[in-house]
Amino acid sequence: MRTNSLSFRLIFTSAVVAIVLLVSAAFLLAYLFQSAVERNFDARLRAILDGLLANVELGTDGAPGMEGQIADPRFSIPLSGWYWQVSPPKDKALGELASESSLEKRLVPTDADLKARDVGGVASFYILDSEGKELRAIEQKFNLFGGEDEFSFLVAGNFDELKEEVQAFRRALYGVLALLGFGLLASILLQV
């Protein structure tokens, strides 16, 4: 087949268009799946944050205290990758609360992590714990009833657990789209 023939140009352009579209679809679908997983994970963290808010009250000294417990047992397992903490403003020494799982180690988000907030004032970001686990965290500031100070409520979950599912989806997606690509190329070659 000559490179300047009509059939060669038709095969070549069809193959290039098919490959570009399949690669674009692969990246777009992988991104959309990752975004959906993050939104779902953030919604779970938000539900835990709401439960935490319902259980924290100010003491007579102005320090926060826990009235009940968080129902999820992962927050009691040491260094599980599931943490919550309630911190006072940086200029106040009111004491802070944290989950048993943190073992006195606190998560310290950067100012950049806390800068971007959604409409509800929630910052969502990734952070590493002391064990090197990648965590998905949300943070929101609240004024507790009866107090003037704005406390930082942070809840974080082990995102490494979900990364394996995301990777499995990507492998399956890339495999299926590669097979589809080979099928399209074969059909283009057979038709021309």
What are these regions (language model features)?
Residues 13-15, 20-23, 49-56, 104-108, ...:
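A generic short-segment signal for beta-strand/edge and adjacent turn/coil regions
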Residues 2-90, 164-167:
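Juxtamembrane segments flanking the first transmembrane helix
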Residues 54-55, 61-131:
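Extracytoplasmic ligand-binding sensor domains of the Cache superfamily
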Residues 26-36, 171-172, 176, 180-192:
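Cytosolic-side ends of inner-membrane transmembrane helices, especially those
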Residues 13, 132-133, 145, 151, ...:
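Short leucine-rich amphipathic alpha-helices used at interfaces
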Residues 101-172:
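Extracytoplasmic
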Residues 55, 59-62, 147, 172, ...:
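Generic macromolecular interface patches on structured domains
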